[in-house]
From Swiss-Prot:
Cited Pfam families: Gelsolin, Sec23_BS, Sec23_helical, Sec23_trunk, zf-Sec23_Sec24
Record note on quaternary structure: The COPII coat is composed of at least 5 proteins: the SEC23/24 complex, the SEC13/31 complex, and the protein SAR1.
Domain of life: Eukaryota
Protein name from the UniProt record: Protein transport protein SEC23
Species this protein is from: Meyerozyma guilliermondii (strain ATCC 6260 / CBS 566 / DSM 6381 / JCM 1539 / NBRC 10279 / NRRL Y-324) (Yeast)
Underlying gene: SEC23
Keywords of the record: Cytoplasm, Cytoplasmic vesicle, Endoplasmic reticulum, ER-Golgi transport, Golgi apparatus, Membrane, Metal-binding, Protein transport, Transport, Zinc
Gene3D superfamilies: beta-sandwich domain of Sec23/24 (2.60.40.1670), Sec23/Sec24 helical domain (1.20.120.730), Severin (3.40.20.10), von Willebrand factor, type A domain (3.40.50.410), Zn-finger domain of Sec23/24 (2.30.30.380)
Ligand binding (Zn(2+)): C56, C61, C79, C82
Biological process terms in GO annotation: COPII-coated vesicle cargo loading; intracellular protein transport
């Protein structure tokens, strides 16, 4: 079974598929033992059990009965993780190999339990809308939100908060008149203050029950308030607060988010809910100010942040981090949708999405298809008509005594529960084996790292076991448990270990570690760490003779890894010069969300060539791939770009494709568009689509991604072989040459 087939079954992909047998050997592998785990990975034939799972009796283990358990005819089972003997349920007595319960079936290494405990409340959605925007963009946003109401479950609860200079909490329970409560936009209200202001006795018709907590009137079932909500949305207008010349609009996004998180916490703490922020510009009021209201005050840049010259940055980060921590505690999620050319402060707000599993969508305006389609795709449904999102989840990682959990990197938060299987060596968010997943979807993928605890030699083919238990609130109103159990061999044989290396998963895992380090360390230090790691890995696993460059050889399991690292070093994830702080935060957020294949596309984009005399084919991400008679399709995950070579572009401008005798040219021009459309179908967020040609202004998006093997200062390579890239970046060939020299010289 290859790595991708195993991923399709269990949603797990390891850097090393065989583990070193001792702690000392594990310390020499350079790339840590890690897995990319997608808890809700879609699987057509997923086994489903309509009852509660059976747990190991060992309180330090509590693993779930699984196919790797040994079943005793006497009516007990032995836990493979801790070795505890546990009794089988009475109705399992007398089971045979031909009559196994579903959870013991070998095909049930991943299984979903639908537990008997129902969820007492439906999912909650709270819109937080910025009204400081032009009429056309506000109208487009309102139209999209009204369309989306039909996609929510009918019993879902919904609420509305709007903000400009002030914050308005709308009372959807008021049918006769539109009623809202106004809060100052320059104050941070705590839960008690909000409760005192909003939780007032409500006059009701005689005989009608009255809520003990009247705050519930701000979050009501869509099926009951769709008309009132639609009416309020249709009549929303631009914030009336005057904006003087030379000023930015007064926006109270920080206060609005604080009120929203407190309102959900006071009403539905511990039940799945999403706060959805629609921002058309930066917060210009404290709390949470991103930039001051005067236009003469510039927005912070990467350089300002590095030099500690961004005067609002640390205070804003601290404020939004506090909201994120409170939201995680309550089990809620925050999504951020930006619809403007300006920065809204995604960098400062990143913890709101990062810790709660929320999404970030970055678009130029709410009128764009990037926003509209991305937002509506959030409400995609499964075959049974339920939303493809889980709420208020937890991830519990169990492992056998040979292993310990080092940490997790992804959109989750630590539950700070320490167990015996937690390693002292932390990678990412460590110190625990249990994490909060406020939101989890079939796309959410987590990098989980392990440490070998074993110190003495093991017998050949000794097995280790890892179990991932994901508990979450399903959109159908049930609590579910997705259990994935995997087994890996422990070996002291370096050749066996080498053969088990998955260089694609390893590259993605190392990219996540790199981004995690980038949040804390200087950018140059992070790049040096990446380089040292690559040199050490090659020194350990490459074949070479000391001081002889030409003898350097990497086996097929490692041959692509340096290439991935080269493109990672050049990517927008680490090279922030041409991106705003918000763009960098957005790109990094998405990389931390996606699975192995999508992450690799972000690190090393794919390039497909179309020509008249051959079938479409993948080509090198290299400047030599640009030809006058070719069309190239570039997929960076964030952009889908069609590039027409010089000759093709001239033919297209001349309109040859419209002439009957040039039907083959017309077909050639359509082929990349059809393939691009297929790429756009399921992707979230929706990528930006670019159609350009040789000499076009947007061709820079392609050139910036290409390996510059033909540049202005490399005259010998220029000619018929590709296009000239105007850059001082080193090419992959030069990078590999330097790598070989450093490896064979023994340098670190």
């Amino acid at each position: 079974m290859n790595f991708e087939e195993a991923e399709d079954i269990n949603g797990v992909r390891f850097s090393w598929n065989t583990f070193p047998s001792t702690k000392v050997e594990a310390g020499k592998t350079v790339v840590p033992i890690g897995s990319l785990f997608t808890p809700l990975k879609f699987r057509q034939d997923l086994p489903v059990a309509d009852y509660d799972p059976h747990f190991c009796l060992n309180q330090n283990c509590r693993s779930v009965l699984n196919p790797y358990c040994s079943v005793d005819p006497s009516g007990s089972w032995i836990c493979p993780l801790c070795g505890t003997r546990c009794p089988l349920p009475p109705h399992y007595q007398g089971i045979t190999q031909d009559n196994l319960p579903i959870e013991l079936n070998p095909a049930s290494s991943t299984i979903e339990y639908i537990t008997a405990r129902p969820v007492p409340n439906p999912p909650i959605f709270l819109f937080v809308i910025d009204t400081c925007q032009d009429d056309d963009t506000l109208q487009a946003l309102k139209d999209t939100l009204i369309v989306s109401l039909s996609l929510f479950p009918p019993n879902a609860l919904i609420g509305l908060i709007t903000y400009g200079a002030m914050v308005q909490v709308h009372d959807l329970g008021s049918e006769s008149i539109k009623k809202s409560y106004i809060f100052r936009g320059d104050r941070a209200y705590d839960e008690k203050q909000i409760n005192d202001m909003l939780n007032k006795p409500v006059l009701t018709p005689q005989g009608t029950p009255q809520f003990a907590n009247s705050l519930f009137r701000f979050l009501l079932p869509i099926e009951e308030v769709e008309y009132q909500l639609t009416d309020i949305l249709e009549n929303l207008t631009r914030d009336p607060w005057p904006v003087a010349n030379g000023d930015r609009p007064l926006r109270s996004a920080g206060s609005a988010l604080n009120i929203a998180s407190n309102l959900l916490g006071l009403t539905y703490a511990g039940f799945g809910g999403r706060i959805m922020l629609f921002a058309a510009g930066p917060c210009t009021l404290n709390p949470g100010m991103i930039v001051g209201p005067k236009l003469k005050e510039p927005k912070r840049s990467h350089s300002d942040i590095d030099k500690d010259n961004a005067k609002h940055y640390k205070k804003a980060m601290k404020f939004y981090d506090g909201i994120a921590a409170k939201t995680v505690k309550n089990g809620h999620t925050i999504d951020i949708f930006a619809g403007c050319l300006d920065e809204i402060g995604m960098l400062e707000m990143k913890s709101l999405c990062h810790q709660t599993g929320g999404c970030m969508v970055y678009s130029d305006a709410f009128t764009t298809s990037i926003f509209k389609q991305s937002f509506l795709r959030l409400f995609n449904k499964d075959n049974d008509g339920y939303l493809l999102m889980g709420f208020n989840g937890t991830l519990d990682i169990k492992c056998s005594r040979e292993l310990k959990v080092s940490g997790l990197i992804g959109h989750a938060s630590s539950l700070h529960i320490k167990s015996p299987n937690v390693s002292e060596n932390e990678v990412g968010v460590g110190g625990t084996s249990q994490y909060k997943l406020c939101s989890v979807t079939p796309q959410h993928t987590y990098a989980i790292f392990f440490d070998v605890a074993n110190t003495s030699p093991l017998p050949p083919n000794a097995q280790s076991y890892i179990q991932f238990i994901t508990h979450y609130q399903h959109a159908s109103g049930t609590y579910r448990l997705r259990v994935t159990t995997v087994s890996n061999i422990l070996t002291g044989d370096e050749q066996v270990l080498t053969q088990s290396f998955d260089q694609e998963a390893a590259a993605v895992l190392m990219s996540r570690i790199t981004l995690f380090k980038s949040e804390q360390d200087d950018g140059a230090d992070v790049l040096r760490w990446v380089d040292r790691m690559l040199i050490r890995l090659c020194q350990k696993f490459a074949d070479y003779r000391k001081d002889l460059d030409e003898t350097f050889r990497l086996g097929p399991q490692f041959s692509l890894f340096p290439q991935f690292i080269y493109y990672l070093r050049r990517s927008q994830f680490l090279q922030v010069f041409n991106n705003s702080p918000d763009e960098t935060a957005f790109y990094r957020h998405v990389l931390m969300t996606e699975d192995c294949n999508n992450s690799l596309i972000m690190i090393q984009p794919t390039l497909t060539s179309f020509s008249l005399d051959s079938e479409p084919e993948p080509v090198l991400l290299d400047s030599v791939s640009i030809k006058d008679d070719r069309i190239l399709l570039l997929d960076t995950f964030f952009h889908i770009l069609i590039f027409h070579g010089k000759t093709i572009a001239e033919w297209r401008k001349a309109g040859y494709q419209d002439q009957e005798e040039y039907a083959n040219l017309k077909q050639l021009l359509e082929e990349p568009k059809q393939e691009a459309a297929e790429l756009l179908v399921d992707r979230f967020p929706l990528p930006r689509f670019i159609d350009t040609e040789e000499g076009g202004s947007q061709a820079r998006f392609l050139y910036s991604k290409l390996n510059p093997s033909t540049t202005y200062n490399n005259q010998s390579a220029i000619g018929a072989n590709g296009a000239v890239v105007l850059t001082d970046d080193v090419s992959l060939q030069v990078f590999m040459s330097h790598l070989q020299k450093l490896v064979v010289s023994g340098s670190t």
